[in-house]
């Protein structure tokens, strides 16, 4: 069973991922990977020596084409799941982004972005990302607006 937990902070060296809950003009922004039939929030792995904020900026640009945006850290999250990193707890930083402008073309493994009024039914990570959004809503007070 997958376990997701939330923290106010964690040792920077433990942060391996950045996930960005992304909105534009009051709508949700999700990514569709070219090899999947599901949607996901933008995010990805931290590169060696990379600041976690830079990870979030890089992933947001690579996966959505966002070129004008505000970006704020929300909280630390962790995931523990059998078969995922040998069942070890892994940590990431959850961010909130408001995108004002996108590039016209994507330059990554992402086939397209979807700008939606509602949350997806088919998630790439159904045991994780809906919980991240719920925590984002709780901590930011933004809800589905």
Residue spans of the language-model regions?
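Acidic, metal-coordinating catalytic segment for phosphate/diphosphate chemistry
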Residues: 1-19
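Class I (Rossmann-like) S-adenosyl-L-methionine-dependent methyltransferase catalytic domain
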Residues: 4-10, 77-89, 138-141, 145
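Short connector loops at helix/strand junctions that flank enzyme active sites
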Residues: 15-17, 23, 34-36, 41, ...
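Active-site beta-strand termini and strand-to-loop segments that position acidic
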Residues: 22-25, 97-99
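Conserved Nudix-box catalytic region and its N-terminal flanking loop in Nudix hydrolases
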Residues: 23-62
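Unchanged
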Residues: 46-70, 77-131
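…; additionally, a secondary subgroup of soluble metalloenzymes is captured
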Residues: 125-145
């Amino acid at each position: 069973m997958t376990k997701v937990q939330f923290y106010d902070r964690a040792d920077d060296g433990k942060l391996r991922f950045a996930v960005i809950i992304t909105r534009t003009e009051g709508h949700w922004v999700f990514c569709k990977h070219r090899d999947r039939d599901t949607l996901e929030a933008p995010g990805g792995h931290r590169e060696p020596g990379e600041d976690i904020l830079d990870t979030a900026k890089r992933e947001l640009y690579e996966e959505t084409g966002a070129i004008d945006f505000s970006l704020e850290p929300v909280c630390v999250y962790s995931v523990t799941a059998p078969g995922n990193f040998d069942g070890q707890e892994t940590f990431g930083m959850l961010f909130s982004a408001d995108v004002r402008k996108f590039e016209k073309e994507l330059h990554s493994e992402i086939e397209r972005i979807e700008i939606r009024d509602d949350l997806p039914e088919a998630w790439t990570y159904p045991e994780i990302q809906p919980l991240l959004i719920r925590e984002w809503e709780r901590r930011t007070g933004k809800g589905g607006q």
